[in-house]
């Protein structure tokens, strides 16, 4: 009897501790953060217990998302109408809650600038991203903080310096040829012009570039990895629609979470196979995978080394091809709907490519108009809509003391469309605003953050820009593009911003 009583006491204590822990995670910690910020004058919508403002977000989306005008580049009102409403109500800095998280949204220029001066040990990637995006990014560079982030960046970043990119341009050219040939064959069969849904072609092209440049293999060999990562992206995006208390479902053995777990394990095994096959294969184009494998051996157990390899390879596979692909897709959409800029970019590409079987770095530098088109596309359609950080210690942004545990959210779309920073034509496609560089394009350069801001600026931006320039230049010298009657302008958020119903274009072969 005494043993049973003792067991009951232990169970009651453990249950009490578990309940206190859950209460702290789901409510008390958030209340403390909210009080500290509100004492400093930070306002925001009033949250409810467990759900925070998630029910209000759903209501606002239902009421306001239909206000978007068809064809406009400013689609914030469709995807994030609550951001617009709360900014109008509370100003460029406000606080809202998703239940367990207090999110400080910052779009004030001075505070955005301040974010860039904090290190990843102080203002790093949120822990919830490491958990919710683990299947896509593992424990790689995208999600790590502190010393581990610094170590991984030191290993990987040099592989994307310009001296390495020079050697990748031919690989980009090689990956572009199959798309050019496929489109030419399709168009020839239709008498010189036909509709092509370009999305998958550009995704496969970008995936092929990453496979060739970083892993020493072709897209065909890595096709299964990219296919499963795309499935993972869609599954996680669907799961992300659960917010507030319902977000707890993603940690239960539901059909969705089981699908993600299965795909995650399949991708893991495929990546390890590719990495083992390529390791120590002495080829100048697979030095990245060797650098990752060598870096994984630094005092790690076998299991930890595998996690290191898989996490960083996932980051490069997914992050390296998806954002570049969707940018190329939006570039073609904007050029198709702005024929005057398409003609200007084509004339420049014709001049630069004339007599060249392969472009080089000097040729890419001469593509001034093409570069402006890419920069303007990244302004209007940044692949990642928000930049997320977590205060890992107490930090100060402007005059605001931000307590540890606060999620700091920077809405890229709102920065890029801010009329005070960009002028009254901020919603319009005007590549010439970048004619004299980013500094002259807007009043504050830190209001343009397609590749991030501060020490966590994307390491792959040199490769992305080189790839986009080569692909656009080659496509423009071969084809003319115009909108298909079937195109429906409906940007969708699926971890990246992409056309909701694909991008069908009328493609004409040039003489």
Swiss-Prot record:
GO cellular component: membrane
Location relative to the cell: Membrane
SUPFAM superfamilies on file: Cytochrome P450
EC number of the protein: 1.14.-.-
Main location: membrane
Membrane spanning residue stretches: 7-27
Required cofactor names: heme
Membrane topology (Lumenal): 1-6
Protein name: Cytochrome P450 714C3
The species this protein was found in: Oryza sativa subsp. japonica (Rice)
Gene name per UniProt: CYP714C3
């Amino acid at each position: 009897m005494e043993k049973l009583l003792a067991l009951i006491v232990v169970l009651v204590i453990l249950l009490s501790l578990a309940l206190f822990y859950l209460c702290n995670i789901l409510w008390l910690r958030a209340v403390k953060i909210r009080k500290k910020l509100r004492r400093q004058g930070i306002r925001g919508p009033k949250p409810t217990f467990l759900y925070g403002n998630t029910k209000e977000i759903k209501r606002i989306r239902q009421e306001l998302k239909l206000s978007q005008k068809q064809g406009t580049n400013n689609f914030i009102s469709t995807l994030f109408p609550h951001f617009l409403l709360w900014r109008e109500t509370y100003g460029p800095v406000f606080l809202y809650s998703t239940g367990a998280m207090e999110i400080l949204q910052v779009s004030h220029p001075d505070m955005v600038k301040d974010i860039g001066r904090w290190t990843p040990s102080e203002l790093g990637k949120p822990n919830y991203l490491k958990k919710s995006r683990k299947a896509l990014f593992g424990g790689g560079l995208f999600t790590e903080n502190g010393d581990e982030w610094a170590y991984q960046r030191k290993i990987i970043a040099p592989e994307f310096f310009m001296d390495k990119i020079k050697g990748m341009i031919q690989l980009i050219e090689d990956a572009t040829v199959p798309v050019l040939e496929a489109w030419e064959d399709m168009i020839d069969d239709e008498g010189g012009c036909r509709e092509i849904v370009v999305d998958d072609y550009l995704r496969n092209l970008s995936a092929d570039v990453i496979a060739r440049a970083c892993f020493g293999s072709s897209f065909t060999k890595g096709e299964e990895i990219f296919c499963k990562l795309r499935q993972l992206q869609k599954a996680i995006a669907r799961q992300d629609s659960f917010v507030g208390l319902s977000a707890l479902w993603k940690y239960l053995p539901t059909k969705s979470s089981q699908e993600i777990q299965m795909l995650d394990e399949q991708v893991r095994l495929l990546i390890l196979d590719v990495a083992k096959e390529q390791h120590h294969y002495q080829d100048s184009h697979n030095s990245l995978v060797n650098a990752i494998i060598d870096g994984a051996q630094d005092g790690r157990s076998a299991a930890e080394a595998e996690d290191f390899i898989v996490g960083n390879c996932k980051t490069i596979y997914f992050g390296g091809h998806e954002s570049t692909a969707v940018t190329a897709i939006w570039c073609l959409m904007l050029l198709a709907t702005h024929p005057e800029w398409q003609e200007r970019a084509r004339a420049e590409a014709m001049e630069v490519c004339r007599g060249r079987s392969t472009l080089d770095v000097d040729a890419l530098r001469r593509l001034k108009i093409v570069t402006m088109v890419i920069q303007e596309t990244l302004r209007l359609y940044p692949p990642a809509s928000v930049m997320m950080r977590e205060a890992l210690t107490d930090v100060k942004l402007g005059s605001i003391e931000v307590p540890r545990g606060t999620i700091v959210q920077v809405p890229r779309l709102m920065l890029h469309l801010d009329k005070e920073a960009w002028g009254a034509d901020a919603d319009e496609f005007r590549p010439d605003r970048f004619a004299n560089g980013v500094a002259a394009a807007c009043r504050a350069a830190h209001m343009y953050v397609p590749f991030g801001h501060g020490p966590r600026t994307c390491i792959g931006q040199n490769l992305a820009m080189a790839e986009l320039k080569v692909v656009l230049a080659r496509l423009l010298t071969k084809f003319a593009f115009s909108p298909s009657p079937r195109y429906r302008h409906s940007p969708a958020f699926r971890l990246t911003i992409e056309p909701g119903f694909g991008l069908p274009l009328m493609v004409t072969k040039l003489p």
